[in-house]
């Protein structure tokens, strides 16, 4: 079904924002209770997570400015999550605040959360619930003309694959 979002973090706030903007992304919303922003262009959602003491902050401290998580659209997130666990995936718990969606996630490479999202319709998406859109800002900016993400890689460090294959 595709990608819902890519989550980024940096140990130094202010590092990634100008890069997103140069690429044509606009900040369109802020999280209701966390130091997290939503950048968007076309149907591409980038989450910039600057929340202290979060999985994202620990990931950024270890890896530097980087992708610290990603979300995939699925028909039924709980069913997909349970199936992933049956196949050996490791669950990962993400702290949620009041009035915030609990997003099922499994542990990806380097501990990056891989979220499974089944709420992506206009008006009931995780952005409509967890974020506040900025006044006077287009919610779906055209930006530089990028429309969707069709693929990306989830790379491993050289020689780390031996630890994963047993």
Regions found by a protein language model. Give the residues of each.
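Acyltransferase donor/substrate-recognition loop-hinge adjacent to the catalytic core
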Residues: 114-161
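Conserved small/polar residues in nucleotide/adenosyl-binding loops
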Residues: 162-166
């Amino acid at each position: 079904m595709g990608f819902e979002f890519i989550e980024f973090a940096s140990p130094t706030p202010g590092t990634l924002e100008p890069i997103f903007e140069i690429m044509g992304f606009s900040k369109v919303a802020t999280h209701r209770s966390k130091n997290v922003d939503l950048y968007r262009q076309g149907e591409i959602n980038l989450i910039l997570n600057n929340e202290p003491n979060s999985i994202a902050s620990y990931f950024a401290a270890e890896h530097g400015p980087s992708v610290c998580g990603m979300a995939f659209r699925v028909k039924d997130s709980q069913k997909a999550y349970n199936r992933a666990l049956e196949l050996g995936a490791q669950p990962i718990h993400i702290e949620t605040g009041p009035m915030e969606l609990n997003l099922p996630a499994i542990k990806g490479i380097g501990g990056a959360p891989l979220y499974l999202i089944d709420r992506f319709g206009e008006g009931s998406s995780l952005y409509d619930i967890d974020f506040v859109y900025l006044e006077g800002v287009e919610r779906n900016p055209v930006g530089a003309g990028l429309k969707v993400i069709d693929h990306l890689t989830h790379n491993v460090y050289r020689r780390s694959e031996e630890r994963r294959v047993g």
